[in-house]
């Protein structure tokens, strides 16, 4: 996939994950839908990005949701290194967009050194428009190492679009909305809150009736910030020792969490990392 054009059929041939169906309790009226905080983080295809409506140089909206920060997955088709910035073009098969990554700090420079022409990347950035031309001011970018992530991104884009368009056309209000239990780490929409990504990617069965005891304890442990940022993950022996849970139970919990799409193995089948922010 690195050497040629984006192949949509090939990308969707793999397996992906849908966001969790968990929702949180409604506290707002649906009339506030169009007044979302501009910091809302939305996964978008470049076709969606190009069709987003705008009322100025920094006010964008799509499906009735205000946006400024976007998540994009695509292939770098052009790249130019400058003294204090890197200009590049990302193509995801639905369109392309100019991107710029400013490199003032060492960490920013090292981040861009890991990105090469032809690579598929996942980036976060602010959507801008200047003289009628849209671009993304990137503040985070990394190579895609698991191509299931491409499938997941497109699936999430479709899910978010369908949810927000159905919500916008519905007539659910605060009086008619049915309260639902709050779930840890949930980023799913309420009847008055559009879908937006949060600190983790949520997948099916992550929080259901069977997610109790050891599984939840292990997941919470792997979702700690110190483990989220670790590329190597955590060894099952360390998890068992830290949590004081029998190793056999920890291994069973890890296997179930892996099947649920909540975690994945890293160095080998004994080290695991949460899919949060993967």
From Swiss-Prot:
Task: Quote the DNA-binding region ranges, renumbered to this chain.
Answer: 70-143
Q: Do the record's keywords include Phosphoprotein? A: yes
Q: List UniProt keywords, sorted A-Z.
A: DNA damage, DNA recombination, DNA repair, DNA replication, DNA-binding, Nucleus, Phosphoprotein
Compartments (UniProt record)? Nucleus
What does the UniProt record tell us about how this protein is modified after translation?
Answer: Phosphorylated in a cell-cycle-dependent manner (from the S phase until mitosis). In response to DNA damage, recruited to DNA-repair nuclear foci, as a hypophosphorylated form.
List the transmembrane segments.
none
**Which Gene Ontology molecular function entries are recorded, alphabetically?**
DNA binding
Which is a Gene Ontology cellular component entry for this protein? nucleus
Q: Which biological processes are named by the entry's GO terms? A: DNA recombination; DNA repair; DNA replication
Please tell me whether the keyword Nucleus is annotated for this protein: yes
Which family does the record assign?
A: Belongs to the replication factor A protein 2 family.
The record's note on quaternary structure and interaction partners says:
Heterotrimer of RPA1, RPA2 and RPA3 (canonical replication protein A complex).
Instruction: Describe its function.
Output: Component of the replication protein A complex (RPA) required for DNA recombination, repair and replication. The activity of RPA is mediated by single-stranded DNA binding and protein interactions. Required fo cell division in meristems. Involved in the maintenance of transcriptional epigenetic gene silencing (TGS) at specific loci (including some transposons) by regulating histone H3 acetylation, 'Lys-4' and 'Lys-9' methylation.
- This chain belongs to which protein, by name? Replication protein A 32 kDa subunit B
| Species, as recorded | Arabidopsis thaliana (Mouse-ear cress)
